Amino acid sequence: MCGIVGYIGTKREAYPILIKGLQRLEYRGYDSAGVALINKGRELNVYKTKGKVADLEEFCSDKDITGNVGIAHTRWATHGEPSSLNAHPHYSQSKNLAIIHNGIIENYAEIKHNLIEKGMTFQSETDTEVLVQLIDYIQTKKKLSLLEAVQLALYQVIGAYAIAILDKRNPDTIIAARKQSPLVVGIGDGEFFLGSDASPIVEFTDKVVYLDDGNIAVMKLGEELKVVNILNEELSPEVRTVDINLGEIEKGGFPHFMLKEIFAQPQCLKNCMRGRVHPEHTQVTLRALIDHRDKLLNAKRIIIVACGTSWHAGLIGKQLIEEYCRIPVQVEYASEFRYGNPVVGDGDGDVVIAISQSGETADTLAAVELAKSKGAFIYGICNAIGSSIPRATDTGTYIHVGPEIGVASTKAFTGQVTVLTMFALALANAKGSISGGEYNKVIKGLAEMPSVIEEVLKTNDQIADLARTFTYARNFLYLGRGYSYPVALEGALKLKEISYIHAEGYPAAEMKHGPIALIDSDMPVVAIATHNGMYEKVRSNIQEIKARQGRVIALVSKGDTTISKIADAVIELPDMMECLEPLVATVPLQLLAYHIAVCKGKDVDQPRNLAKSVTVE
């Protein structure tokens, strides 16, 4: 959830690289930032402050920021309030060491108590300071090398971590370690880079090593990258080549990343379908289904595990798979699944689909490990190539929508739904559970989605005007049925994430079982009321809302003349198959949330208290 950056080399000053890296990681969410640098005089300088990276830059403007080795961090508070004192890096008591850390040390209180009894003092409320004090204590008392002290300390630690450590007595070395929290090492010519993901690294090198759980990396000037485990057994990490276009992690003329990513969706869907959807041959090809045909064809049950927006995509996947493959599907919050003693295993013909944009979502990764331990076959749907979930699964499909920087997911959602649609079509065709005519019709419609979304994006100005009308609403209700119900959930989530307006998504038919009590002139209701599905039923719901003075924004099929007469505002969508409607209907809801948040003056790309990649529980 926080951001880690590191640099060691002889060619460049570390500070500019660290600051630029932190800026690349701002999308992950944070409340404070800091850097640690070793200068040529072997002084270890730590500078940190509450607030944004820009605040850190201002704080450092009159400080000694020289040096070719350094680490930097953006913090999202878990232990201790957001403050300069609790910000990272943390010194050890001797001030020989500085550490940055993502994750949670679960037994920090016990370790801290023991260290206090041994005479150690603490400056912050964080679990991270406990870890650096432990390393310092071990190193001093046992007269060990930094690596040995780190290994012994990590042996005592319970919890998740990604850490990077500097020692002013060893200014030519950075040590980093990982357990259940992502960490990437970039390898340059005589220099090393470090990041929570590849985005702070790719400007300087495309050669990276994704550290696995239990890995400890030693980056030392003049030497090759060394990776060992806690027992000091040397490992042979795979050096990968990453392909990230720098333009994808810059705004490119848009005021916010979120708006850029909304407008990128037509191209993203083309990228997602390239080489997979062949409308000219009416065929969908997924390598994972070819390589694991028998396992997937023999599935008796599919369990989808995900969190947040990915969970909403999973709900759409459930309907697609059940409709076309005739396989029962259950959709679980990964956080509930992992602790719920689920009945899952290979003996029951279970396939578990794990969905995560980052591929690092802690609860989803834990759910994967649990299902795997019980013998289930695991299929991953992720965006970040080389991330932890794809490496933990049996097979899977990348959505290929490029880096998503805005905290509120947009293009990743439509990418996930596109992959789930392709998965359902390919599996249904292999099973023979879909007619040839229907199969061809859905493929043709899917291939047309990029141009359909381009058409919907033309409503941007209309939606911006509409947003101004509802800027001061305190609550919203979103309604949908069938395939549109998960879209209603996603629309409500987008609004609450970035505008801080309370919003709920509900099945339209359930309105009378509670939510209708909330309807009055102060309650805007967004209703998805296209000609697909249960049009007449949703129209009746809208009439019930209007009878109670509710204000209705309706998403309707192009040319609808009935609902437009009773709704306060309508947004027209092109006609399409019901199963493809989520890909299109979600776009105006993304735009509505975006424009309301902008009107309210909110930080759209970095909403409060949220992180892009949730790598802790």
Model regions and ranges:
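Conserved short alpha-helical segments that host acidic/polar catalytic motifs at enzyme active sites
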Residues: M1-K251, P255, Q267-K300, Y339, ...
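Hydrophobic alpha-helical scaffolding
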Residues: I8-K11, H101, T121, Q139-K143, ...
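Glycine-rich oxoanion-binding loops at beta->alpha junctions
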Residues: N68, A72-L85, E280-R293, G317-K318, ...
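Structural motif
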Residues: V69, L97, R301-I303, V351, ...
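Extended hydrophobic-aromatic, low-complexity segments
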Residues: G186, A313-L315, Q330-E332, A362-L365, ...
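Generic C-terminus detector
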Residues: M258, R551, S564-I566, M576-E617
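Active-site phosphate/pyrophosphate-binding segments
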Residues: Q265-L269, M273-I303, T395-P524, A597-E617
